[in-house]
Each structure stands twice: as C-alpha cells, then as structure tokens.
C-alpha cells in the first residue's frame, strides 16, 4: 500500500499554486484566439473555434473585460437580474467564452511544460504528427488482437455533477481563486439553463459554448479513471513498460480509494495482484470509448468489469450501469471503434497432406483482424447530412444549389475523398463503393436541380467521364505514394492501407 501511495502522489512538488493572476494579462486572451499558433508547429495547443465571436475579438474588448473584472461588485450581482449584471445579460456568452478560453490556455500551460520535461527525460521528442495520428491504432490491433480471446467494450461514463471535474483539477492545481472561478462558470450555466430550459443538461450548454475548457476538464477526468489502471498494469506486468501518461499526480487520490482497495486486497496488495495479472492485457481508448482485450479467461474479464463499476462508485461517487461494459469472445463479436466495425473471426480451412501412399485432410483455423465500413450507420450519417434519404437513395442537397458548378463539384469531391481516405483500411470495399455512389449521384442531382434539368439528361450532356475523380482519386494518390509497386493499382486498392496523417475522426464518421 505504501508503494501505491507513493505512486499516486508522484510529483506533488510540481503542482501549480498561482495561476489566477494570469487571467488579468491581456496577452492570454490574444493567445487563446490566435489560430495561427497551430500552423507554427505547436502540438500542445489546439485552437477551439467559436462561431460568431472570433471576428468580434479585439484587444480593446479584452481591456474592457479586465477592467470590469476589477470591480468589486461585478461578479457577485444576482444572476437573476440581467439588467444589472451584464455578465449574464446579452453579452453573457461573449464574456464567459473569453474568460473560459483564457482560463483553458492558463491551465494547459502547466501540463504542456510537464509533457516537455517528460519528453526531454526520454531524450527523444517524437514528431507531432506521430503523436496525433489516430489510424496508428489499427496496425496495433492487427498485430495484437488476433492472439487474444476476450474483449471488453467499455463506455466511460460522464460524471453526474460538474463539481467532480473541479475536484479532479484540484489535485493538480492548488490555486483557490482559479477553482472558484471555474465553479462560478458552472453555477452560471446551471442557473441560466434552468431559467430557459429547466430539463436541459448542464453538460450540453457548457460543452457547446466552451468546448476547449470542457474537453480539458473531461480529459482530466479520463486520466483520473485510467491512472489506477496504469498502476495495476505496471505492477502486474512481467516487463515493466513505460507509461505514456505523464499527468498522474494525485494529492488526495490514495485516501479516496483506500477503502475500496482494502476490500480487494485484504490488507496485502502484492499477494492479490494475481486477480488482475495478465501479461497479454491491452487497453486502447479514443474519446469516451475504450477497448480492454485479454488472452485470459472470461472470469478475469468479469473481475475487471466489477472493478471498474466499484471504482467509479467509490472514487467518483456515482453509480455506473454495468451494462456499459460488454464482455465477449473475439470469435463471435464485432465492436465499433473509430468509425470501423472490427472483428477477429475464425477462418477454418482444410489442408491436404500427402505421406507416401496415404493422404489425409488437416483442419486448421486462423484468426485475422477484419475492419469493415458499417454501412447502415453510415447511411444514417449521410441521411443526417442530407446526401440521401434513410433508405440510402441519393437526393439533392438544396443548400449547395446556389453555389457555382465548380464549387458544388469541389465540395462533393472533397467529402468523397475524405471518406475514402479515412476508410482506406477497410477489409471489404463494397460499402465504400456504395458511399461513393451515393455522393456521386447526389452531386448530379444537385447540379440537375440547379440547372432545372433531369439527372439522365444532365449526365448524357456531360458524358460518362463526369465526376470520374470520385473513383480514381484514391488510385492517383496511391500511385504517387507507392510508385514502385509492380502489381496493378486495382489490386493494391483492394488492400488495407492505414494513413498516419489522420489526426481526427471524420465529421460524418463522428455521427456513428
């Protein structure tokens, strides 16, 4: 237990105590709204776009806001009196977004510096694109999952109260005024949403209007969920792997989970690690969904499921439904992850063996990691985007009908290329071909609607080469990337190719 306590309280001396004064520095707000920083190569900063306010920002507005914050009675006025308190009046959203964006930049500074120091200790700073590629997960799946037996499909629950996020951040930042300001944001959105829509969730308004700050707090919560998992994994592994998590300090983490661990460990932590001991355990997460795969038995996965449910209840003080964790065998289970429907089916085959005059058949079974495009959910996403109806029949897109012909073709072509690029790792291309067909015909219907013509007449007038790039763009890209391939491109196009330049999930795929 002493080893656990020391692990969870690691690097407490690095906690940040004085962040609140930075809120009154004008350059912080300029930094929060400078979208050019991302182009200069900084991968610690990902600008969050806030529609409708970027163009209105100026240094003069920041000065006025800072001046108002200096007033003693400014932040303590009643939130119910919108005439006296302009912070919750018609400028409420603008002012709160400016402060929250600045606050997000400030709290990220400490973690960015810590990440730099951890990379310098390893004497190797990887390139930013290697840190951010999400397609790099699938080659890992190809190498590992075919040798495993069980998988747990986990949906990480949201905390029921926003105060939990403040308490998690308190373990990293001991600047009391900053935490009070964060509570003020939550209190403001709670009261404002109750006045407008009493049944509206606090998460909805805050996450939509303050995306950067909300994502930072949610990521802090996810790191908290995974910290004890990383510790158990490092203690039970035969080969002590280096953890990729660099923000694992917890000031009061040990006291909160002590009661839960005593029940599990029976006052002897080392002797009970066999409950979770599995050298072939693999854990992958993206956003709020994670995959826990193991070569162990179904009983071991049930122990992990019970652990997660009790951990969320004891440490975060909320009950999570056990149905959020599904345990299945790889042989008869498919799971959604990053827009793909993945599985590890068993492929039986018979091999004829000849020995002298005798011949016999040997039955063999092989496992192969398969990834396909989930066509039904994908059609639903295309239907929401108004490219087709719910049955998958292409329709015109009226909102683009007022654009020029070149702009319409460019938008449809860009959408098609992005989806083709994202789903390049699909094992079967039939679903991808159907998506291309929907986008191609939707483009033709949109152009025909604009010119008040029929699709048949429009295509006949332009010829069969119309929109050919919808189907040939990927092969052109492959010919540039792999110019020395000796076999035909159409055969190469049927192979799975993972691109390591994809840094975020596709917008249409994100609807799945």
UniProtKB/Swiss-Prot annotation:
Molecular-function annotations in GO: RNA binding
Covalent S-S links between cysteines: none
Species: Amorphophallus titanum (Titan arum)
Keywords from the UniProt entry: Chloroplast, mRNA processing, Plastid, RNA-binding, tRNA processing
Family of this protein: Belongs to the intron maturase 2 family. MatK subfamily.
GO cellular component term of the entry, any: chloroplast
Subcellular location, record wording: Plastid, Chloroplast
Protein's recorded name: Maturase K
Superkingdom assignment: Eukaryota
Predominant place of localization: plastid
Function: Usually encoded in the trnK tRNA gene intron. Probably assists in splicing its own and other chloroplast group II introns.
Encoding gene, per UniProt annotation: matK
Keyword RNA-binding recorded: yes
UniProt-listed GO biological process terms: mRNA processing; RNA splicing; tRNA processing
Keyword field contains Lyase: no
One Pfam family of this chain: MatK_N
Record lineage: Eukaryota, Viridiplantae, Streptophyta, Embryophyta, Tracheophyta
């Amino acid at each position: 237990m002493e080893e656990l306590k020391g692990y969870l309280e690691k690097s407490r001396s690095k906690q940040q105590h004085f962040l609140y004064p930075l809120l009154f520095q004008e350059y912080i707000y300029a930094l929060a709204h400078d979208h050019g920083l991302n182009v200069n190569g900084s991968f610690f900063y990902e600008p969050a776009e806030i529609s409708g306010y970027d163009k209105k920002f100026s240094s003069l507005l920041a000065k006025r806001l800072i001046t108002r914050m200096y007033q003693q009675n400014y932040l303590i006025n009643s939130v119910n009196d919108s005439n006296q308190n302009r912070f919750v009046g018609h400028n409420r959203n603008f002012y709160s977004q400016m402060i929250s964006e600045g606050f997000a930049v400030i709290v990220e500074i400490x973690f960015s510096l810590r990440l730099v120091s951890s990379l310098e200790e390893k004497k190797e700073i990887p390139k930013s694109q290697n840190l951010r590629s999400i397609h790099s997960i699938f080659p890992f799946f190809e190498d590992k999952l075919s040798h495993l037996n069980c998988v747990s499909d986990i949906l990480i629950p949201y905390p029921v109260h926003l105060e939990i996020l403040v308490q998690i951040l308190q373990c990293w930042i001991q600047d009391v005024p900053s935490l009070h300001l964060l509570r003020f944001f939550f209190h403001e959105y709670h009261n404002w949403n109750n006045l407008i829509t009493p049944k509206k969730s606090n998460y909805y308004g805050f996450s939509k209007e303050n995306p950067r700050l909300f994502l930072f707090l949610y990521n802090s919560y996810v790191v908290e969920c995974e910290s004890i998992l990383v510790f158990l994994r490092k203690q039970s592994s035969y080969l002590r792997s280096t953890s990729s998590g660099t923000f694992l300090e917890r000031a009061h983490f040990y006291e909160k989970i002590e009661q839960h661990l005593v029940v599990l460990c029976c006052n002897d932590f080392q002797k009970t690690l066999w409950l979770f001991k599995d050298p072939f355990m693999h854990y992958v997460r993206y956003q709020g969904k994670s995959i826990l795969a193991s070569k162990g038995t179904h009983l071991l996965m049930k122990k992990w499921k019970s652990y997660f449910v009790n951990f969320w209840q004891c440490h975060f003080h909320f009950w999570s439904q056990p149905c959020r964790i599904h345990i299945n065998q790889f042989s008869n289970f498919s799971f959604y992850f990053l827009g793909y429907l993945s599985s590890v089916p068993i492929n039986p085959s018979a091999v004829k063996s000849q020995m002298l005059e005798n011949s016999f058949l040997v039955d063999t079974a092989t496992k192969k990691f398969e990834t396909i495009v989930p066509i039904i959910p994908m059609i639903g996403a295309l239907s929401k985007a108004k490219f087709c109806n719910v049955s998958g029949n292409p329709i015109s897109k009226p909102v683009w009908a007022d654009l020029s012909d070149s702009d319409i073709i460019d938008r449809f072509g860009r959408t098609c290329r992005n989806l083709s690029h994202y789903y390049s790792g699909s094992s079967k291309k039939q679903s991808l071909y159907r998506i291309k067909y929907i986008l191609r015909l939707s483009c033709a219907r949109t152009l025909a609607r604009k010119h008040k013509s029929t699709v048949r007449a429009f295509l006949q007038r332009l010829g069969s080469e119309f929109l050919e790039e919808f189907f040939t763009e990927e092969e052109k890209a492959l010919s540039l990337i792999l110019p020395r391939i000796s076999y035909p491109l159409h055969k190469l196009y049927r192979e799975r190719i993972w691109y390591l330049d994809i840094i975020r999930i596709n917008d249409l795929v994100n609807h799945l």
